[in-house]
């Protein structure tokens, strides 16, 4: 799969760092696009060229980790605070693959992980009020990121739409129907989930 690919999309996290090492060990002459400073650093150390996302005409495949993924490949990417840029690369890619261990796979996304909103700083107060109307308890992570905690989520698609329609919201950490596959590492080996 990797041999025919020139430009990779790479997210952030420890798993992606291991993937970078694999790419280098496999002797692949590739370029990468990534929003992660840590991944950029690892790529630089390994001699993998990182190009600006705007300079990537085509991304065949992008790999990323996540906080939680359900059986329909919906995922939360709430931890790193770079979900907007990760989602741009995911949408650019012809195939978006999540790399996770078995502990991150759930039947349905639950409310243990917050939905994080990237917001225009001047809209943080307004967005907070609108999110509260949708049933969220809101915690400000910083001036651009709001963490939304819900007691329950009945309809992921509707929640995703409702949050994106709030003026001042740039993007959400809910990756609804974005991933095409997940590579899951477990005690019994590797399995592939796909939509």
Where does each model-flagged region fall?
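N-terminal active-site beta-alpha-beta segment that forms phosphate/nucleotide-binding
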Residues: 1-64
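Conserved phosphate- and dinucleotide-binding cores of soluble alpha/beta proteins
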Residues: 38-195
């Amino acid at each position: 799969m990797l041999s025919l690919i020139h430009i990779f999309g790479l997210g952030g996290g420890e798993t992606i760092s291991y993937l970078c090492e694999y790419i280098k060990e496999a002797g692949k002459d590739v370029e990468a696009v990534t929003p992660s400073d840590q991944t950029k650093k690892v790529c630089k150390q390994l001699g993998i060229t990182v190009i600006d996302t705007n300079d990537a005409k085509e991304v065949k495949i992008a790999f990323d980790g996540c906080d939680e993924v359900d059986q329909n490949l919906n995922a939360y990417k709430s931890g790193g605070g770079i979900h907007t840029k990760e989602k741009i690369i995911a949408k650019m890619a012809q195939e978006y693959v999540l790399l996770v261990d078995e502990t991150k796979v759930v039947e349905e996304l639950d409310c243990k992980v917050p939905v994080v909103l990237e917001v225009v700083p001047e809209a943080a107060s307004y967005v907070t009020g609108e999110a509260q109307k949708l049933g969220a308890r809101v915690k400000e992570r910083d001036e651009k990121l709001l963490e939304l905690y819900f007691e329950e989520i009945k309809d992921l698609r509707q929640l995703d739409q409702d949050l994106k329609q709030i003026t001042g919201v740039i993007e959400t950490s809910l990756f609804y129907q974005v991933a095409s596959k997940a590579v899951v590492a477990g005690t019994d080996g590797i399995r592939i989930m796909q939509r």
